[in-house]
């Protein structure tokens, strides 16, 4: 596909999202998951076996891995220049942790790209989840809300991404003693502008490209990951709607029995997709929990260490807010998934009518009620699930460690 086609493929989510927002009667043909996948394909970094069979894709994926590896290793080597300066070393470590998170995701989905695509295909196959035909439930309000939420999240991320990239690639112009967007060191001092101006210019462009490409891809994979769980939450809402309108849609015992049997399978399909999703994202969920924990701890520790320097405190305060915001977002959607899943048993109980139905119908509803009492969770076993209760526990743990470290430093 040509460059113009890929650009259109990338911005299509924002174009369709804006049209959808402006026109309440408009219904999107796809979920947000589809659009995020299209953006990753437009960047040539949707790492599935099918994509790798396309011209130049496999070579590009290999080149991306080499770029990420070189960038990460040179950033690690750059720490040797910061030894003795606690603030600079803390800043270097923070960027290394952040870039390691990006590189880990790139490596991880080289292995799990096909399984990720299986989840996406399953969600797109069943979207919008509701049974079609006479008596179909009106799911459009819920669908519009979730799609609009995804659109505004994507738009806000895009704005902040552009601002962050602009600040990062121009930082050598306004940050004292910084000569590259990312502090890094190369052999033979190739990064020193005064000694090797040509190689310095090349490294500057290399880092600028990496910053733009990898951060944009990170937003896409994060958006895809979040949207998958949001789509599962939407499926739960559709299931609840169909349960609550069961007797309005079904007339006669046979039709009722067939429908309750379908709803049992519908519920089981949601559980199966969620289990598969948790399995696919197992490594990344653990990694982002650990990365956020370290970034929050590091930023607070460095801010306390340099508390007499307002500029340094402001830098690490922003870093802390970014880490907390990222963790809060995942905790919110994890909570939303769990809370909505608990309404399944309530909806099934409302569908129970002793006057109508048969023994088979009651058995199906009881099965849904029993299964629905266990909340569906976003989790990477054996670690705790993503919700605000565990989020608070992580913050308390950070506070305890920092208190101990500060007392030790004093």
UniProtKB/Swiss-Prot annotation:
UniProt keyword terms in alphabetical order: Cell membrane, Membrane, Olfaction, Receptor, Sensory transduction, Transducer, Transmembrane, Transmembrane helix
Q: Which residues cross the membrane?
A: 60-80, 93-113, 149-169, 223-243, 280-300, 313-333, 386-406
Q: Name one GO molecular function term.
A: odorant binding
For this record, the Gene Ontology CC terms, alphabetical, are:
cation channel complex; dendrite membrane; plasma membrane
Membrane topology of this protein: Multi-pass membrane protein
Q: Which GO terms describe its biological process?
A: detection of chemical stimulus involved in sensory perception of smell; signal transduction
- Coiled-coil regions listed: none
Q: Give the main localization category.
A: membrane
Q: Which residues lie on this side of the membrane: Extracellular?
A: 81-92, 170-222, 301-312, 407-410
Topology feature Cytoplasmic, residues: 1-59, 114-148, 244-279, 334-385
Q: Name its cellular compartments.
A: Cell membrane
* Extent of the signal sequence: none
Family per record: Belongs to the insect chemoreceptor superfamily. Heteromeric odorant receptor channel (TC 1.A.69) family. Or49a subfamily.
Q: In UniProt terms, what function does this protein have?
A: Odorant receptor which mediates acceptance or avoidance behavior, depending on its substrates. The odorant receptor repertoire encodes a large collection of odor stimuli that vary widely in identity, intensity, and duration. May form a complex with Orco to form odorant-sensing units, providing sensitive and prolonged odorant signaling and calcium permeability.
Could you give the subunit structure recorded for this chain?
Interacts with Orco. Complexes exist early in the endomembrane system in olfactory sensory neurons (OSNs), coupling these complexes to the conserved ciliary trafficking pathway.
Further notes on this entry? The atypical heteromeric and topological design of the odorant receptors appears to be an insect-specific solution for odor recognition, making the OR/Orco complex an attractive target for the development of highly selective insect repellents to disrupt olfactory-mediated host-seeking behaviors of insect disease vectors. Odor-evoked OR currents are independent of known G-protein-coupled second messenger pathways.
Q: Return the protein name.
A: Putative odorant receptor 65c
Q: Which organism is it from?
A: Drosophila melanogaster
